[in-house]
Structures are given as C-alpha cells and as structure tokens.
C-alpha cells in the first residue's frame, strides 16, 4: 500500500476500462490463467452503499461537483454502471432534515449519498459559505440520521500521511485482523533513529 485515500477516492473506472481492454487484447492469457474478474465491482459497490442504511431498497445517488472535476468521467461511469442518479448539489434539497432529489415526478427522498465532493464544499451552511457545489442543510440531515453520506465527513483525516505508518496497527487493534496488504517501509522523521536513517540515506 502506497497511500490511503478515504475522502473521495477515484480511479476505479480506469481500472475497469483497462481490464476490459486487457481481456480483449490478451484473451488467450485470460482464458488460460485463473485471473479473478472485476466486472461486478459496480454492483458490489451499489450493494455496499445500500447496506449502509437499514431502509429496504434505498435511494442511492452519486453527488458530483460537476463536469469540470478531473474525476467527472468516473462519476458518470459509476452512476451508469450502478444504475443510480448522478446529481449535483442543485439537484438536492433539504426539508425537515431530510434530503430530496428533484425528479420528473416530484421529490424523491435520498437515503444514501456517495459523495465525490470534498468536505469543505458539501454544505455551505456548515462549512464554506461560498460553496456552490454542495447542498444547503445536508449536515443537519446527516446529523439527524436521515441520510447516509459515504464516505462520511471527516474520513479524510485518514488520508493524512502522518497516520500512514500507524494503519497496520489500527487494523489489528480495531478489527482484530492482520492487514491484507503490507505498507511500504515508512520512516517518521520525528523519531531520532528514523531521522538519522533518512539523513544518512538521502
């Protein structure tokens, strides 16, 4: 593991498209070798998102900052593959601490938001007041337990490079499991021995 991206991770659409191309160009290898398929990723992601709420057949949406975002292709790709609406902040409204999507047939309550917008921009009433990307009042609906936001606000703290060396120990402590993938060797320059090693090996 090189780094952890929990805030708004991206790149899976490129992996899926690359695999499709590889399976076409290298069909013999894929036929002869037991390589695990990944084409069910969108359905598994949708099931995982749906399982984050106790509601039966929840309304899941992907919240995008828009087409000028570098990962917009992925947002649209996943929405299409998962068969869920791709929404912008202006498509959603909060009433009585519940989130609704403006639809052709009226408002539809949203149960799970797979957000692809960074924390400071998701709710102008709670964070950056000049944000036009988020949904006014979203955090009040979230705090009331009326909508699930994935990844939850604040998860970006785990992206911090200072936490990276501790992730294997956190997995062992909180999950009582061994990490599946090892981290690369990491030196913390605040530790005298690590600092010495880094300086000696520049």
Regions found by a protein language model. Give the residues of each.
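Domain-scale recognition of functional cores that engage charged ligands
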Residues: 1-202
């Amino acid at each position: 593991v090189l780094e952890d991206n929990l805030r708004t991770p991206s790149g899976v659409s490129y992996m899926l498209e690359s695999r499709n191309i590889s399976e076409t160009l290298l069909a013999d290898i894929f036929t002869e070798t037991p390589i695990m398929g990944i084409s069910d990723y969108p359905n598994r992601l949708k099931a995982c998102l749906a399982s984050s709420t106790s509601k039966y057949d929840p309304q899941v949406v992907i919240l995008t900052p828009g087409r000028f975002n570098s990962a917009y292709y992925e947002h649209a790709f996943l929405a299409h593959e998962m068969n869920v609406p791709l929404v912008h902040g202006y498509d959603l409204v909060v009433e009585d601490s519940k989130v609704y999507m403006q639809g052709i047939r009226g408002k539809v309550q949203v149960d799970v938001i797979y957000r692809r917008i960074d924390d400071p921009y998701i709710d102008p009433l709670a964070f950056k007041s000049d944000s036009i990307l988020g949904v006014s009042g979203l955090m009040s609906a979230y705090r009331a337990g009326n909508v699930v936001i994935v990844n939850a606000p604040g998860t970006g703290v785990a992206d911090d490079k200072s936490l990276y060396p501790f992730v294997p120990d956190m997995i062992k402590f909180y999950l009582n499991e061994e990490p599946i993938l090892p981290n690369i060797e990491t030196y913390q320059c605040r530790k005298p021995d690590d600092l010495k090693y880094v300086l000696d090996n520049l």
